[in-house]
């Protein structure tokens, strides 16, 4: 189980200095997918949000984000707020899909009929990485607790011939 390691890492990462730091966490748990429900992501997200809160983080929590637009709005909220913080932490639990060398978080209600739909409807993890790396936060952490079994893949025709 990954949660104890996450918690230990979190504790070590946030105790960089004795002074009070402003801490912001974005916590997302997606479970109610249109292709079947995942058992743990929402509960894991709620536990993580509670842990962050107990450690003095301001927490942005969202669960079962249905569309790419809604997902982007939550990320945008985090991005706009994080400038005022010393520590930025993003935790995602839900479906994750890799296409080529890119990784994507998947909203719960998007229909991925073919592999290329991931580009249109998924959230590229690089967006989160860019947000974290361009900030002036002392500490930035991204944890993807993503289910990598791809329930959409059986529908995809991967014939790549011209």
List the predicted regions and their residue ranges.
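Caspase-like (clan CD) cysteine peptidase catalytic core
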Residues: 2, 59, 68-93, 97-157
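Sec-dependent N-terminal signal peptides
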Residues: 4-14
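Boundary at the C-terminal end of the N-terminal hydrophobic targeting segment
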Residues: 16-20
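Short glycine-rich His-centered loop
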Residues: 21-36
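Cofactor-binding loop segments of dinucleotide-utilizing enzymes, especially the Rossmann-like FAD-
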Residues: 28-30, 64, 145
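Glycine- and acidic-residue-enriched helix-capping/strand-helix junction motifs
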Residues: 32-46
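A generic structural signal for short, well-ordered alpha-helical segments in conserved domains
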Residues: 45-49, 59
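Short beta-strand elements in bilobed, periplasmic/extracellular small-molecule ligand-binding domains
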Residues: 53-63
